[in-house]
Amino acid sequence: MITVWPQYLDKNLSLNEGRKVSKEIAVEEPKLQDIEKALKRLNLPYSTQKERSYPGKWYEKSGRILVESDKPKLELLKEISLKLQEIKQ
């Protein structure tokens, strides 16, 4: 299982604040629903936990998604981010 926090894909955050992908492929303020759409289009099984808080922002309930994948985490995050760019256009 790979944990995907919306912060990993957020263009507005720095690497120190939690972004894991490059700014070129990151998206502005990704929502859980958008990430779910991207995962459906990628045909990846997942489960959503909406009441979870990102450790760096424990006061915000941003939620997280657990994805079943054998791919390395960064490769998966890049795929999700690119799919999010398609969805948001």
UniProtKB/Swiss-Prot annotation:
UniProt entry keywords in alphabetical sequence: Cytoplasm, Ribonucleoprotein, RNA-binding, Signal recognition particle
Keyword Magnesium found: no
One of the record's GO molecular function terms: 7S RNA binding
GO CC annotations, alphabetized: signal recognition particle
Pfam families registered for this protein in UniProt: SRP19
GO biological process: SRP-dependent cotranslational protein targeting to membrane, signal sequence recognition
Entry-linked Gene3D superfamilies: Signal recognition particle, SRP19-like subunit (3.30.56.30)
Location of the protein in the cell: Cytoplasm
Highest rank taxon of the organism: Archaea
Known partners and oligomeric status: Part of the signal recognition particle protein translocation system, which is composed of SRP and FtsY. Archaeal SRP consists of a 7S RNA molecule of 300 nucleotides and two protein subunits: SRP54 and SRP19.
Entry similarity comment: Belongs to the SRP19 family.
Function, in words: Involved in targeting and insertion of nascent membrane proteins into the cytoplasmic membrane. Binds directly to 7S RNA and mediates binding of the 54 kDa subunit of the SRP.
HAMAP family: SRP19 (MF_00305)
Protein name: Signal recognition particle 19 kDa protein
Naturally occurring in which organism (per UniProt): Methanobrevibacter smithii (strain ATCC 35061 / DSM 861 / OCM 144 / PS)
Lineage of producing organism: Archaea, Methanobacteriati, Methanobacteriota, Methanomada group, Methanobacteria
